[in-house]
Curated annotation (Swiss-Prot):
Identification of the protein by name: Aspartate--tRNA ligase
Key words, A-Z: Aminoacyl-tRNA synthetase, ATP-binding, Cytoplasm, Ligase, Nucleotide-binding, Protein biosynthesis
GO molecular function: aspartate-tRNA ligase activity; ATP binding; nucleic acid binding
Region (Aspartate) location: 198-201
This protein's encoding gene: aspS
Amino acid sequence: MYRTNTCGELRLSHLQQTVTLCGWVQRVRRMGGMTFVDLRDRYGTTQLVFNRDSAPAELCDRAEDLGREWVIRATGTVMERSSKNPNIPTGDIEIAVGEMDVLNRSEVPPFTIEDETDGGDDLRMKYRYLDLRRHCVRSNMELRHRMALEVRKYLDGEGFLEVETPMLIKSTPEGARDFVVPSRMNPGQFYALPQSPQTFKQLLMVSGFDRYFQIVKCFRDEDLRADRQPEFTQIDCEMSFVEQEDVLSTFEGMAKHLFRTIRHVEISEAFPRMTWHDAMKYYGSDKPDTRFDMRFVELMDVLKGHDFSVFDSAAYIGGICAKGAGSYTRKQLDALTDFVKRPQVGAKGMVYARVESDGSVKSSVDKFYTQETLQELRRTMEAEPGDLILILSGDDLMKTRKQLCELRLEVGSQLGLRDKNKFSCLWVVDFPLFEWDEETKRFYAMHHPFTSPKPEDIPLLDTDPGAVRANAYDMVINGVEVGGGSIRIHDSALQQKMFELLGFTPEKAQEQFGFLMNAFKYGAPPHGGLAYGLDRWVSLFAGLDSIRDCIAFPKNNAGRDVMIDAPSVIDEAQLQELFLELIPNEN
């Protein structure tokens, strides 16, 4: 037996017991004739003591020579610490060591293995196996495990079966780019890695598996950002014989179960619901952060027609009221203007108005507006003395709302309104079924081609497809879309109509999705489902800024695994075996 206990479990109740611990040397401290070693494993840290008054000199000499991250085994007696450490669970005890074996030496690590480390992101990703030794990173993995366990418990209790679906599938043209895999046995043909198990879970519904789930890897070849990775994990679910209310109730229940068991937060009230139209109108986003108010107010009627050309020519003028932010300095306001002018936001400028203590309004465009008009602005914004009104305008309504959304989030962060330990949950419903692409002059599915239109909107498919609402829904928490889904089309004729509107010829639809349309001919039940992003859930509960920090071996923002140096070139022999030839990149 290598060890009798872990480095996180010993307490005063274990005094005078002889124990054996194994782990990594966190740090070594020498004080007079004593050497203190902090020994760390997955479970915690325990202090070891090598005392020259009671331990062999040879043992104490070896203890002094220990280096950081050496792997050792130590046997000794549990003693009460004279100088206790209240910051760790084992802080009341220490081990008076009588025997020690060095199991493996370590080179000096390239960064400190501490919560507050001196290693940058790139260096820590290159040595991810060392980064995972840090308590803060390891705790994210433990949280991920507990959440996956609770998901399985809840869904099993609701009668769901966990069923695995294939990883090598057929490539489809909709959505993000596929990762493709050449087939050696079928020259010139390719598999794709699944962007989701969408079609397979629908086939499982046709097969009679009325409640399915799996925690599954998915792959999308798209540009990366803080909440995206080329491979990510979904909690994928589907149900038969359900309407939208059944799905929302089931998975709202799962969310509440996770809050209760993981965060110890009891949520009794139903999640609010907001239409997509209202989310875009009042927040400029289909995933609004409702931890704080600051809703958009349209100001076209108030501010147009006063010889201020920026507003007079605008297709949209919108404002937010930042309560209590009237004390913002000119420097802070200039910084906000610079923020909205950044290429990532794209606004041309920002107008502000401050409500003074006497109720008067002072703005950055006073020469164009009378105090009477500014008071009308104040009333429209419901602003009070000490408040700050921030206004953006533009010639594209949707684009300007998105810019105002970025400004709202930035101001909310500056005012401390986006507390990571406060949670605001809601459902966003009634999405458009289609979105129009001006460049290609065609409709695209806002979610995917299998999303059902709302029954009352089906007649509009022939007359006004852009007005059709989808039977789709997203769960949003703190401005993060943690999950989304829809009621699916289960009728072959309606599915064919959907393909036509998306520009598929009957031949193309049959080639891409014939297997699904054929299955629908054999008694497909009404069905719908939802997929949660496990990575996003974990990062939300852990208070992380990026999902990368809750994935054991993530990719960087260029989609590379710098630890194993992937992707990489392959041998010419492998290329020939796969009937592939590389074309030089002329860029």
